[in-house]
């Protein structure tokens, strides 16, 4: 079994926040607490260490008390660039990622992904949910991976790849079904944020 202490959680807060008017999503308050802090509080009991990937407002993220890593690939190259930055700095054998705007992520996310990797002999694990139409939805931004994937990810990015799902599905992938699709909801707009504030 992959030990909790051998897993570092990486909160992905390095994006432009373009669907939120360019604001830094991770620092937007939800019920009085920055969204990235909600995600951090969800991941803390499931991992041995935490990091945040951010490319602006670094002092604000550093005030959360965990290491902050910036993209080594320029121009906000997307979540994979954040994953790369995390893998480059990770001090444990495994890393799990979650976006900063996922304050409801499951309390058993990491142990279930780790269990699936062990059971299936997989390289990576990501959650799968089922939408209201019965379609399976991969949630690839939530990904448990070994740090040994670093060179492979560098090669994928150097080849122009930018989609997490394409990269993940090119490996032995454990897809783990979670019943609560709402737990993986991203808060992408200010309207969605207001809805969750009221909820």
Swiss-Prot record:
CDD domains: MobA (cd02503). GO terms for molecular function: GTP binding; metal ion binding; molybdenum cofactor guanylyltransferase activity. It comes from the Bacteria. Mg(2+) binds at residue 101. One of its GO terms (cellular component) is cytoplasm. Keywords: Cytoplasm, GTP-binding, Magnesium, Metal-binding, Molybdenum cofactor biosynthesis, Nucleotide-binding, Transferase. It holds the Pfam family NTP_transf_3. It is found in: Cytoplasm. Its EC number is 2.7.7.77. The keyword S-adenosyl-L-methionine does not apply. Its main location: cytoplasm. Its cofactor is Mg(2+). GO terms for biological process: bis(molybdopterin guanine dinucleotide)molybdenum biosynthetic process. It catalyses: Mo-molybdopterin + GTP + H(+) = Mo-molybdopterin guanine dinucleotide + diphosphate. The keyword Acetylation does not apply. GTP binds at residues 12-14, 25, 53, 71, 101. Belongs to the MobA family. Monomer. The N-terminal domain determines nucleotide recognition and specific binding, while the C-terminal domain determines the specific binding to the target protein. Transfers a GMP moiety from GTP to Mo-molybdopterin (Mo-MPT) cofactor (Moco or molybdenum cofactor) to form Mo-molybdopterin guanine dinucleotide (Mo-MGD) cofactor. This is Molybdenum cofactor guanylyltransferase. The lineage of its organism: Bacteria, Pseudomonadati, Pseudomonadota, Betaproteobacteria, Burkholderiales.
